[in-house]
């Protein structure tokens, strides 16, 4: 098998695993986490909602763009994949260091830095997109990244329909109402998973939580880019 065929096989296996229904244990964990979320003060809910709203607005406006500084156009997809893996690890370390600092101060200090934690994750997506050769100065590519973020933290119910939009992006992007998308974006993210971004909330704490969640986001992005590129290549 060629390198591209191996990457396609890996991506398809990931897709099958990703789209499966949550296990009984995962559903139980989600119910427990939901109970925890219900005890979180309304003030924190408001900060989370506003943080996501500002993240979406900044991304759509292009005010938070960051790109990979080196030209990767001459690299093979396999080489880009290895570079992407190293990039994810690098951002994991940054996120973990931030999580350790905020986690030590409890949930109220953590929520104060929540926008920064979101920013780290979006910077990771911008960098990965740039590595794979996509132009993040293009507004539609930035929307694509928001969808990838949304997919990584989507609920079991909305996962398949969202994945379908991403998988058929070249067609779907023509029919998306960007204003409605921006208004509804927050509602489609699984609140349970969103609160897991907060150090000190959920099964993992502080730096560990951020390290794992950045890995989850990075792996989702990496495989989505593989599927997109290989599909476009096959269609040429």
Swiss-Prot record:
Q: Where are the transmembrane segments?
A: none
**Top-rank lineage group of the source organism:** Bacteria
- Signal sequence segment: none
Q: Which InterPro entries match?
A: EcsC
Intrachain disulfide bonds? none
Instruction: State the function annotated in the UniProt record.
Output: Unknown, does not resemble components of ABC transporters.
Protein name according to UniProt: Protein EcsC
What is the originating organism of this protein?
Bacillus subtilis (strain 168)
Starting at the broadest rank, the lineage of the source organism is: Bacteria, Bacillati, Bacillota, Bacilli, Bacillales
């Amino acid at each position: 098998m060629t390198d591209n065929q191996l990457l396609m096989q890996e991506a398809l296996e990931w897709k099958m695993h990703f789209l499966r229904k949550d296990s009984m244990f995962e559903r139980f964990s989600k119910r427990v986490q939901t109970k925890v979320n219900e005890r979180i003060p309304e003030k924190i809910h408001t900060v989370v909602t506003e943080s996501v709203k500002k993240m979406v607005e900044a991304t759509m406006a292009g005010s938070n763009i960051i790109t990979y500084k080196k030209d990767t156009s001459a690299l093979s997809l396999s080489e880009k994949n290895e570079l992407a893996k190293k990039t994810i690890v690098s951002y994991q370390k940054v996120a973990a260091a931030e999580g350790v600092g905020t986690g030590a101060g409890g949930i109220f200090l953590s929520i104060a830095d929540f926008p920064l934690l979101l920013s780290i994750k979006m910077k990771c997506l911008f960098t990965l997109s740039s590595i794979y050769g996509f132009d993040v100065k293009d507004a539609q590519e930035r929307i694509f990244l928001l969808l990838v973020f949304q997919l990584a933290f989507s609920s079991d119910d909305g996962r398949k329909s969202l994945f379908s939009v991403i998988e058929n992006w070249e067609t779907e992007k023509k029919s998306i109402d960007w204003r409605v998308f921006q208004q509804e974006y927050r509602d489609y993210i699984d609140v349970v998973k969103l609160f897991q971004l907060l150090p000190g909330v959920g099964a993992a704490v502080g730096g560990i939580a951020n390290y794992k969640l950045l890995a989850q986001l990075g792996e989702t992005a990496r495989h989505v880019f593989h599927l997109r590129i290989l599909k476009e290549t096959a269609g040429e």
